[in-house]
Amino acid sequence: APNDDCSNPVVINGTGLFPFDTTTATTGAEGQAETLCYAFGTSNVHNDVWFEWTSPTTDTYSVETCGFTSLDSKISVHAGTGCPTAGSSIGCNDDNCGLQSAVWFSATAGSTYTIQLGAFSATGSGTGNMNIYPIILPPNDNCATPDVIAGTGTFNFDNTLASTGLEGQNEALCYDFGTSAVQNDIWFVWTSDFTGSGRVTTCTGQTID
């Protein structure tokens, strides 16, 4: 693949669908040890290709393969140009929509970002399209702007368009099934109206995992 190496990315701009082909790509050394990419026992992005994208606006953007490939994909985004240094990923995702990926991150108009797209499996490769578009986040997507709730009862939530923030992603108590990440998270501040033990649950009436 011509953009198999991070030193020779395909330059793209704007929003929409951008084709990719990893069928002849190899697994480079760069972008392979990112904490944000760790899922299901590995942080590797196999058989990866690279893109250099300039944001047209200051917004939260999604870079995703949902609905546009059969590849079990993995995507990582790095700020700036050139081959990324270790620990520089600002967003990474393996399975957001089935086996496909979606990374949401804050972009600044005129700034350039390096996108790494590959496979979860060492033997995975394929073709498809990468979709880039701005999204409107829920008001409590950021921990700085939580929904304020109090007392007991049922409180509605909707994380359909929520992004995965950096905060609260490496908690030892959250580690399960190979990851401690809380994907597509939203935030609440709750004031208790009682003294004693309480329980927070989504056990009834929800289909989200």
Show where each model-derived region lies.
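Acidic, Ser/Thr/Pro-rich low-complexity intrinsically disordered segments
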Residues: 8, 13-14, 24-138, 145, ...
